[in-house]
């Protein structure tokens, strides 16, 4: 059997031509489409990677912001807690100070009330004692007590010379007022002692049964008293001064 090489060669040429034609007109567009698709896929994958990177960057940024916000929130909460504690401490301190102030005011008020009460009791006691003493001296006083008071007053006239002369002025007469009539020798002693201080001034004796036992000497526009009441008034003034309150005003006391 003989081979027709011309036919074989023609078949080979036809096959190669077919391959070329297939590659040229069929496979090339397909390959180009595949390449384009792969390029598109690669581009989209690149875009996806970029998007993923952006997303990861955003996520990292958001996480950082969240962490910062959490830190800021914690700092704000801590600052708010410290501020609340400081305000609470300030309010408690203010309340304690106010309470201590009110307690001090109440204590001072109680002490003041107690002092006022004691002073009132002392005043009432002193007034009662003075009233009883005044009544007792009035009831127990006799001519002998009044005579001794007058003699004591007469002995003090010399020490009161300047005051007596100023009180007398141009007056030429003095009045000695007692509760009971004085004995002649007592009148003479008082007249003599007054004359030694005030020359030319006469002395007249008068009696007032309602007067406190002792001597009231009227001279010009002045009156000097050495009576039981005047002594008690002086004692009352001393007690009132010691108690820090004004004394009741009475006649001039020369005791």
Swiss-Prot record:
Its main location: membrane. It is found in: Cell inner membrane. One of its GO terms (cellular component) is plasma membrane. Pfam families: ATP-synt_B. Belongs to the ATPase B chain family. InterPro entries: ATP_synth_b/b'su_bac/chlpt, ATP_synthase_B_chain. The keyword Chaperone does not apply. It is a single-pass membrane protein. GO terms for molecular function: proton-transporting ATP synthase activity, rotational mechanism; proton-transporting ATPase activity, rotational mechanism. F-type ATPases have 2 components, F(1) - the catalytic core - and F(0) - the membrane proton channel. F(1) has five subunits: alpha(3), beta(3), gamma(1), delta(1), epsilon(1). F(0) has three main subunits: a(1), b(2) and c(10-14). The alpha and beta chains form an alternating ring which encloses part of the gamma chain. F(1) is attached to F(0) by a central stalk formed by the gamma and epsilon chains, while a peripheral stalk is formed by the delta and b chains. Keywords: ATP synthesis, Cell inner membrane, Cell membrane, CF(0), Hydrogen ion transport, Ion transport, Membrane, Transmembrane, Transmembrane helix, Transport. HAMAP family: ATP_synth_b_bprime (MF_01398). F(1)F(0) ATP synthase produces ATP from ADP in the presence of a proton or sodium gradient. F-type ATPases consist of two structural domains, F(1) containing the extramembraneous catalytic core and F(0) containing the membrane proton channel, linked together by a central stalk and a peripheral stalk. During catalysis, ATP synthesis in the catalytic domain of F(1) is coupled via a rotary mechanism of the central stalk subunits to proton translocation. Coiled coil: none annotated. This is ATP synthase subunit b 1. The chain crosses the membrane at residues 5-22.
